[in-house]
Design a protein with these regions (language model features):
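Active-site rim/loop-helix segments in enzyme catalytic domains that contact anionic ligands
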Residues: 24-153
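Metal-dependent de-N-acetylase/amidase catalytic core
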Residues: 2, 10, 24-53, 140-304
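Bacterial N-terminal signal peptides
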Residues: 9-19
Length: 304
């Protein structure tokens, strides 16, 4: 017969083991996706004001995932900066197009799109890398440049491709690279002994980005929905429409102006593309919001 001491020992053992048994039996339905569905911004995104926002993408037009939200943030007196890593100088099927010409076209299209959102030209940064070749670039140099701009702008919020899920491993090479490079730069920017010359010789300060808005991920990973109805939806449509070289017949045979018989169809297609995500009949944009240290960007809830 067990003694009282034995009973106490068994009870203590059960108390120690039971929590781990419960956790082990809890099914993982995320498929490795960082969820964080219970994490929300302390202040709703549509009430943000006075923040500095940095959007990082691979190509001119990658920021279109967030055009509606950027329009809203700009109206609410937030400062928006857009950093694109490549010139987009390969994205065409036009046999007569050259890299140099397409690079200039895509710069002009991006600036026109940003203007439609109220974002000034001097808030646009392009690192100048060749489209499709980002993963072969010197990673240290790319991260160094990104860190420089993070330390210069001191952003409160980073918008970027979501690096924290399996889809990126198989997606378009530049998007995959941009997602990881942005995360690596956010991590490096806060450590003063990484790229110390920027601090010791260029007068910059180390900087930690506190909030992240990731786009391009699966719906089940997204935890923030931004209502872009009204003027912001229309601004998004107009901004995306500026990328003629990517979304019209100019993709195969570039002309700076659409043929008259294509204009109506083009704008209809752009509108459908821009406003394809809705909630309660209203256009929205969805993101995976994360707040905290960069090392936790890709962790699932409860991981350490």
């Amino acid at each position: 017969m067990p003694t009282r001491t034995h009973k106490l020992f068994l009870i203590l053992l059960l108390l120690c083991v039971l929590p781990y048994t419960t956790l082990a039996q809890e099914p993982d339905t995320t498929g490795g996706i960082p969820t964080g569905a219970d994490v929300q911004p302390e202040t709703p995104v549509d009430e943000w004001t006075g923040k500095t926002v940095l959007v990082v993408g691979a190509h001119p037009d990658d920021d279109s995932y967030a055009y509606g939200t950027l329009s809203l943030l700009r109206e609410n007196d937030n400062e928006i900066h857009v950093l694109i890593m490549t010139t987009g100088n390969v994205g065409t099927k036009d046999p007569d197009m050259t890299r140099t010409r397409l690079s200039q076209i895509r710069r002009e299209e991006e600036l026109a799109a940003l203007s439609a959102l109220g974002i000034p030209e001097d808030h646009y940064i392009n690192l100048g890398y060749t489209d499709g070749m980002l993963e072969f670039a010197d990673k240290k140099e790319v991260v160094k440049q990104l860190v420089y701009h993070i330390r210069t702008l001191q952003p409160d919020v980073l918008f970027a491709f979501d690096p924290g899920y399996g889809y990126q491993a198989w997606h378009k090479t530049d998007h995959r690279s941009a997602s990881y490079l942005a995360a690596d730069a956010a991590r490096a920017a806060e450590w003063r002994l990484l790229f110390p010359g920027q601090i010791n010789h260029e007068g910059l300060d180390a900087h930690r980005i506190e909030e992240y808005m990731f786009f391009g991920g699966p719906d089940e990973a997204k935890n923030v929905t931004v209502d872009i109805s009204g003027a912001h939806a229309e601004n998004k449509v107009q901004a995306i429409s500026k990328h003629l070289s990517q979304f019209s017949s100019a993709w195969r045979d570039y002309t700076p102006e659409l043929p008259p018989d294509e204009r109506e169809t083009y704008m209809q297609n752009i509108r459908e593309r821009a406003l394809d995500s809705t909630e309660a009949g209203q256009p929205v944009e969805r993101f995976r919001y994360y707040e905290g240290i960069p090392d936790g960007i890709g962790k699932r809830r409860g991981e350490y």
